[in-house]
Amino acid sequence: MLPIPAFLGAKSPAMTIFRKPTLKISEKKKREMPEGLWTKCTGCSEMVHNLALEENLRVCPRCGHHFAMGAAERITLLIDEGSFRETDASMSAVDPLGFKGVATYEERLATYRKKTGLVDAVITGSGSMGGIPVGLAVMDFAFLAATMGSVVGEKITRIIEASTKAKRPVIIVCASGGARMYEGMLSLMQMAKTSGALARHAEAGLPYIAVLTNPTTAGVMASFATLGDITLAEPRAMIGFAGPRVIRETTHQELPAGFQTAEFLLEHGLIDEIVPRAKMRETIITIIRNLTGK
């Protein structure tokens, strides 16, 4: 057997020249992205910095998707600074049916009051827009999907009646999942009550402007949301009575593209105008001036 050359030996010093250096894995922890700084846009799936979102009135700066906006934020956006006076702020719901499920109605109310800081799903009051006195109701979807129960219906009815008495226009910003099932028939009664108040408001020759936001559905859509003298909507808002899945299963038919969107309703004459959030205040002020001559 031929001898193995020394430079090929396992212990040859020459072999150290050709050795692959050992890679050391860093012991440093991965950088974690701080929570609460970014939001994924449901319109374009891009990550949007929360600061940019707030500065843009909760509208995606990339695709224009309108995120949900709280009632207090909308009031600040629409009403002249310092002019808003809330009405019936402490009115709260009771549990007339003693509703029990996974959680009782009272437990759900307590949870959402703590979560949102609201007493119920609507804030009502009076203020001015462009110096013109108005009555205002703004629904907040974050509170039990802004379902309409006895408190929501009563507060909206009261601000309509107060505005009729004071001869003021009424603006209602709508967003709702419908009637509040926890209150049974009492919630359905609010459809007729609010509609009746608006009929008396119209008989007095006073304007009502409805602003439909995403989503406006079911009992609210079938009552005061669609009774406006002028009906405005935010872009791409879902507006309809039953959901698309329920309609498909009931009719066994495919729905048209864009069905139940603000754009579809505008095309078919069911709303008057689609208004981006940034232009909503000036649009409403212009409409009020034209309708009242003020």
Predicted regions mapped to residue ranges:
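N-terminal amphipathic/basic-hydrophobic helices that include classical n-h-c signal peptides
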Residues: 1-15
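Conserved, well-structured core domains of diverse proteins
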Residues: 15-30, 34
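An N-cap/entry alpha-helix motif that binds or orients negatively charged groups
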Residues: 24-28, 39-40, 67-124
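Residues immediately within or flanking Cys/His clusters that coordinate Zn2+
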Residues: 38, 57
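Short cysteine-rich clusters marking metal-coordination/redox-active sites
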Residues: 41-44, 60-63
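Cys/His-rich microdomains that often coordinate metals
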Residues: 47-48, 66-67
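Cleft-lining beta-strand/loop regions that shape enzyme active-site pockets
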Residues: 120-202, 209
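Conserved catalytic cores of soluble enzyme domains
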Residues: 174-292
